Amino acid sequence: MKHIFIINPCAGGEDHSQTIADEVKTMDVTAEIYITLGEKDATRYVEDYCRQHPCENVRFYACGGDGTLNEVVSGAIGHEGAEVTCYPCGSGNDYVRYWDGVDFHHIKGLIEAPAVEVDVMKVCYYDGPNLKVCYALNTMNYGFEAEVCRAMDDVRRKPFIGGRMAYTTGIVKSLFAGRHNPCRFTVDGRLWKEGDLLLASMANGRYEGGGFLSAPRSKNDDGLLEITAIRPISIVRFASIIGDYKSGKYLDRTDLQDIVSHCRGRQVTIEHDSPFYIGIDGELLRGNYFEVENLPRVLRFAVPKK
């Protein structure tokens, strides 16, 4: 098997290229290193490589955050000989938190890791008259969470309020602008929610925002999306539940049943007359209609042993 390390030199506000390259050179494997040139470059590179080497077994190492991992997965999806794993060095690194206690920071462990089959979300959406397709590995968010992603983009690389604090900073900024989000929401062809929502999320992973356990019951290989919606609430009530939202305990609180809804499904649509933002693995898309289909076990993802 060939091993290709795809490094985002801007991930996490620090260039890890040399550290990773030095460790890779000590490994007795056939390996290459590719430094990304900008947004979506990882997807382009992986797609091109798989197209040019259709019979080759290859493992791609996404060296960056969840956005870099998403780009690598988007390029590898559908190519039979391709596997993916992650060396997490971004600002979030949430997808790999699914495997609690597993260390993804050792190159040797990643190279020797067995691959498991995981689900991937296929997302079709309209950007104006044009239908576009992309993929999500970890989470998709509507409403408040997407507004948080927008705010995060503004502060991600700023000192003190950026980096690992970016998600918390985004929450504070969005409290005053992103608490009422109208939409029509269907699950497996049936109307689930219509009207104002604080937020809605669809997940195969469990964590987002640098450690918020927003989908504690999710499984990434069962073919089902973990779907949660929360109705608009006051800032005071929001402040009273944010701790349990971060720890994942909010789904167990009976006093939140009037505002929290939860279900599982394979296919979701979200629509509104006016364009809105959706967060996909921490990145933003804009449209007025999104269709999400969970593709069961379509990606081989390497997970180191504990």
PLM region spans:
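Glycine-rich phosphate/pyrophosphate-binding beta-alpha loops
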Residues: 141, 145, 201-215, 284
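ATP/nucleoside-binding phosphotransfer catalytic cores, i.e., glycine-rich phosphate-binding loops
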Residues: 187-189, 194, 219-220, 229-306
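Phosphate- and divalent-cation-binding pockets in alpha/beta enzyme and binding domains
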Residues: 44, 71-72, 94-95, 147, ...
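Short Gly/Thr/Asp-enriched flexible loops that form oxyanion-binding sites at enzyme active sites
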Residues: 68-82
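Catalytic core of DAGKc-family lipid kinases
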Residues: 4, 12, 36, 78-198
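ATP/NTP phosphate-donor binding region
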Residues: 1-63, 70, 74, 101
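Short acidic/glycine-rich loop or secondary-structure boundary segments that cap or lie
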Residues: 145-148, 193-195, 207-211, 235-239
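Gly/Ser/Thr-rich active-site loops/lids in small-molecule metabolic enzymes
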Residues: 157-166, 208-210, 216-237
